[in-house]
């Protein structure tokens, strides 16, 4: 990947002053819930400078990158996945990838979305039509991929991803994605929140919370309706994550502020970055393995340099024909 540098000194100063690009994972309610809160401001700013899209396309792709990052906590061991959103609307959708090592990359399907009038809000539903959301997982060492597909229901990336978990994996999951622009169309804050109910815990574990928040069935503890309502209310009380990070908020203050009564425990912190495995050497090998007709067409071109753009990260490679 050829990483482009952010040149805006005012934006760079802002990015250096806010909470770091970090995901904080936690468990709460004696293990009945797990969550992850991610400050994605650095990640989506690198995406924005790399792709150089317009504000609308940048907003969609920023949300897509954050959505892919929020899938990383659901990975089992070493794994890669692809999140694809195909719609009949003007935006067409996106295709993004994430890896358990902590990278995200990908692209929007329509890089110049037609709009009929100036944007009045960041409601993206008018640009998403009917379609499908697909998650394909590639576990390390497995010879086959595992794919889950759901119909797009809300035309909202976060809500449709929650719907995917409920329908395809039968897990209640709440997702919040937020991106904040300033008056100059710069991303000054961005983040994502993932909260998921876990299977019932074993009977040997004695809940530390009050008894009315738990039920015991067949020797297993599970969340009562009261606990579910309280957790849902707490999650829905989350402020705008884009604004939270833009105003120098941090992860732990928000986690403990929202969920203190459920005794959250931080399980890990990790970085998630925009990275791509493309390289000049890989693309030279790609060109060498083209079909005979394609190679002859390249030879016939007057230019002595072949220019190739990576579709996952927008890196532009210039390859001398002599290198091929």
What are the roles of these predicted feature ranges?
Residues 2-268:
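Interaction interfaces in information-processing and related assembly proteins
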Residues 233-324:
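Cys/His-clustered metal-coordination modules, chiefly Zn-binding fingers
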């Amino acid at each position: 990947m050829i990483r482009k540098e952010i040149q805006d000194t005012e934006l760079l100063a802002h990015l250096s002053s806010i909470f770091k690009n970090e995901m904080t994972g936690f468990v709460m309610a004696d293990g009945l819930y797990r969550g992850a809160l991610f400050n994605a401001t650095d990640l989506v700013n690198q995406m924005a400078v790399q792709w150089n899209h317009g504000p609308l396309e940048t907003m969609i792709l920023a949300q897509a990158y954050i959505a892919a990052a929020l899938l990383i906590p659901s990975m089992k061991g070493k794994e890669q996945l692809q999140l694809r959103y195909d719609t009949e609307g003007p935006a067409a959708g996106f295709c993004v990838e994430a890896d358990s090592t902590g990278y995200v990359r990908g692209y929007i399907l329509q890089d110049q979305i037609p709009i009929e009038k100036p944007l009045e809000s960041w409601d993206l539903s008018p640009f998403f039509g009917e379609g499908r959301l697909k998650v394909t997982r590639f576990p390390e060492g497995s010879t086959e991929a595992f794919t889950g597909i759901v119909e797009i229901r809300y035309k909202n990336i976060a809500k449709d991803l929650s719907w995917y978990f409920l329908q395809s994996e039968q897990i209640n999951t709440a997702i919040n994605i937020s991106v904040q622009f300033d008056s100059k169309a710069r991303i000054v804050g961005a983040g994502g929140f993932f909260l998921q109910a876990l299977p019932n815990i074993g009977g040997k574990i004695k809940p530390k919370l009050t008894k009315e928040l738990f039920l015991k069935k067949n020797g297993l503890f599970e969340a009562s309706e009261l606990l579910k309502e309280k957790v849902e209310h707490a999650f829905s009380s989350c402020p705008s994550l884009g604004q939270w990070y833009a105003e120098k908020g941090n992860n732990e203050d928000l986690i403990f502020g929202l969920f203190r009564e459920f005794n959250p425990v931080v399980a890990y912190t990790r970085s998630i970055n925009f990275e791509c495995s493309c390289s000049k050497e890989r693309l030279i090998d790609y060109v060498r393995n083209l079909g005979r007709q394609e190679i002859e067409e390249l030879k016939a071109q007057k230019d002595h340099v072949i220019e190739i753009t990576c579709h996952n990260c927008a890196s532009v490679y210039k390859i001398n024909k002599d290198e091929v």
